[in-house]
Curated annotation (Swiss-Prot):
Residues that coordinate or bind substrate: 30, 34, 100, 120, 124, 154-155
Organism expressing this protein natively: Glycine max
Cofactor list: Zn(2+)
Assembly behavior: Homodimer.
Substrates-to-products reaction catalysed: (R)-S-lactoylglutathione = methylglyoxal + glutathione
Alphabetical list of PANTHER family matching this protein: LACTOYLGLUTATHIONE LYASE, LACTOYLGLUTATHIONE LYASE GLYOXALASE I
EC number: 4.4.1.5
Job description of the protein: Catalyzes the conversion of hemimercaptal, formed from methylglyoxal and glutathione, to S-lactoylglutathione. Active toward the hemithioacetal adducts formed by reacting methylglyoxal or phenylglyoxal with glutathione, homoglutathione or gamma-glutamylcysteine, showing no preference for homoglutathione adducts over glutathione adducts.
Pathway where it operates: Secondary metabolite metabolism; methylglyoxal degradation; (R)-lactate from methylglyoxal: step 1/2
Protein name, entry field: Lactoylglutathione lyase
GN (gene name): GLXI
Catalytic site: 170 (proton donor/acceptor)
Keywords (A to Z) from UniProt: Lyase, Metal-binding, Zinc
Cofactor annotation comment: Binds 3 zinc ions per subunit, but unlike the enzyme from mammals, shows full activity in the absence of metal ions.
Other remarks on this protein: Zinc ions may be required for the correct assembly of the enzyme but are not required for catalysis.
Length: 185
């Protein structure tokens, strides 16, 4: 008799296999990072990771700005500002960079907790690239800080880099992620 797949409800107590009809249109839309300096973060996410700025929203009365970054084709975005907001919020897997005004020039500002030191919480986001090793060579040449290079550790072929605020980003490609996870699959 064949073993139940790891994803089956019998192997995952609490798992509901038939989503509630009310959740049919839900998507994973964004992860939010608080950033110290938008100039530095926008450079990293656009130049280093190749993302586009999908939409910027400024809230002067609350003194913060939101920058929505992603891999969408911005030429497809509507030109009407409100329609562009709706378009942005309908895209899958975007990064919302939240800048509280003044942090970039505040010498007392210590930065944000990235979740990877005690107390641990949030860990990282992941970006699929064409070739992990080539991408990491490029990141190295751009001066990006590494947490783990693809040749390090037991999980060969995946890397972790840091963004300017210390958030971790896992870097992998379709081939190496299959090799790395084959014994766990």
């Amino acid at each position: 008799m064949a073993a139940e797949p790891k994803e089956s409800p019998s192997n995952n107590p609490g798992l509901h296999t038939t989503p509630d009809e009310a959740t049919k249109g839900y998507i994973m839309q964004q992860t939010m990072f608080r950033i110290k300096d938008p100039k530095v973060s926008l450079d990293f996410y656009s130049r280093v990771l190749g993302m586009s700025l999908l939409k910027r929203l400024d809230f002067p009365e609350m003194k913060f700005s939101l920058y929505f970054m992603g891999y969408e084709n911005t030429a497809e975005a509507p030109s009407n500002p409100i329609d562009k907001v709706v378009w942005t919020f309908s895209q899958k897997a975007t990064i919302e960079l939240t800048h509280n005004w003044g942090t970039e020039s505040d010498p007392e500002f210590k930065g944000y907790h990235n979740g990877n030191s005690e107390p641990r919480g949030f860990g990282h986001i992941g970006v699929t690239v064409d070739d992990t090793y080539k991408a990491c060579e490029r990141f190295q040449n751009l001066g990006v800080e590494f947490v783990k290079k693809p040749e390090d550790g037991k999980m060969k072929g995946i890397a972790f880099i840091k963004d300017p605020d210390g958030y971790w980003i896992e870097i992998f490609d379709r081939k190496t992620i299959g090799n790395v996870t084959q014994t766990a699959a």
